[in-house]
């Protein structure tokens, strides 16, 4: 701890970030890492034995292709086969008509690259077109490196082998031999979330970060999609299982903030918590067995009173409704998403994005051809790889690519100087490469925030030490050239994406916040009664809120990187946005607490009280996008009916009023914390 205290704050934050990423718990991560690790070693063995060129490309296919579950790996493998056919076909067409004319070759390759980048952003199968774009631009370097058309044709044909045999290998490893099924990962993930919930129910623990809660909720939704596609039993009983996922998410996120020490430990409350934990354990056992859980628990009056006293009645009712749900309930038909985005041909940003990528590639091609420096051809690949829809995400990808390339270059340098002279055979080479590939595979299976570092590190290392050589190599020039090529491509891309049609998310962020607040207002309009339809609707919209707040949080992180904006305006926007996100999460949890006490309200009185909050929030959200929102002020009218209900509800709703009053005023020239007391609220 003393060593960390002596380090600069940015370094401490960076170390904390990597510690969080490297220690991430995710079902299927260990099998995916082992599949990737074994696949890399087999690629090296096969490529060295049969002298197959482009080892780095084969490794890249593995890193992009091996996914967290067998179904996803199969899907990506099919896409890779289609992409290989398209990309090799496009290369042969380019060579046939323009092999000896670089200008004509670029004129033909340019529209292909633009079309691929356009479709990458607008089509559901964007990964296919991304692969075609990579090979289309990488193939332009072959004629410059070789003077013989026959040799270029052979290299291009080798690309088919290089792309397809790792695809076959990852299918054998990840699908046939050692499959990791999505249904198994879902069962493990649900049980892990329930374990965390029980821990917070029985012990006083510090709450987990909200961002982690939201990411876990989104991970469950992604696994649900894979289970629907991969498991027939899950599809048959999908209505029950989707309700199970929503219920587990609600229990996990709600109990994360629960503190059992804040309530009196009467014997009735202690027994009720034990009974609730026992029911959750029964649910876990059924999930482990892959069975739909059915419960015969009926809450007695004393248990209901204890649940209300310790603020667990809504969780209890939600759990019991799941236990009493018919497993054979017919699922709601899912709408098939369109293959193209709705504004694909009306939004000019998509075509501008393609033009910017082409411009960056042409600048790099002109530079490396003009200086006759073939070793830095990775600059063109960099321009395509770091091309992202907006400035912030492009900068994030540039940092990841540069960081991975730097680590890979350092490892390649140390490997060439210290290890390579002592190697005599392929077995020794594999033993030395094993820890490097294992580290890269573990990083590559982390979250999207850092996974590309592992991929880039291994690919850069292979480019510098294993590319097209089938024996010991001591040439340090390769390491220098590959690293400089990546740096040049990153710099050119940064300049292009910053000054040529920059796509800033600064204007989109308030609209995103308004959408999240609008969804929160819909939650408030749902009747606060223990009715099946209302509860299910509430749970599903609540999951959407987790996704909305997480998307806003990630967008804030990207806007921070947009240095083309005025620093003061950017800082003000980020501070206001983070305040809205933080208060929105608090409002959601505070509104959850009102459900337990709102049962005593008359059904006719409920919409009026909830409507006050929903109307105020909708009015505030409508003004966020135009920077015309003031902090909402709500007056709670104390009618005889409201005075007759539990005083706990009034206190809870007054707390919601306080949270409303702390929402930032978007009309103020500078953000100041709200100090005005909300009407109807007490401190």
Model-derived features: positions:
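Membrane-entry segments of alpha-helical transmembrane domains in multi-pass membrane proteins
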Residues: 27-31, 46-51, 74-82, 97-104, ...
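A cross-kingdom feature marking solvent-exposed beta-strand/loop segments within repeated
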Residues: 74-78, 96-101, 147-150, 154, ...
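Long, hydrophobic alpha-helical segments that serve as membrane-spanning/inserting helices
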Residues: 1-34, 41, 49, 151, ...
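Juxtamembrane/interface segments at transmembrane-helix termini
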Residues: 125-128, 175-188, 447-451, 477, ...
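C-terminal functional regions that serve as terminal interaction/effector modules
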Residues: 418-419, 423-430, 434-438, 446-474, ...
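Alpha-helical transmembrane segments of multi-pass membrane proteins
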Residues: 61-62, 354-366, 376-387, 402-414, ...
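Pore- and pathway-forming membrane helices of multi-pass small-molecule/ion transporters and channels
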Residues: 9-18, 33-74, 81-89, 106-173, ...
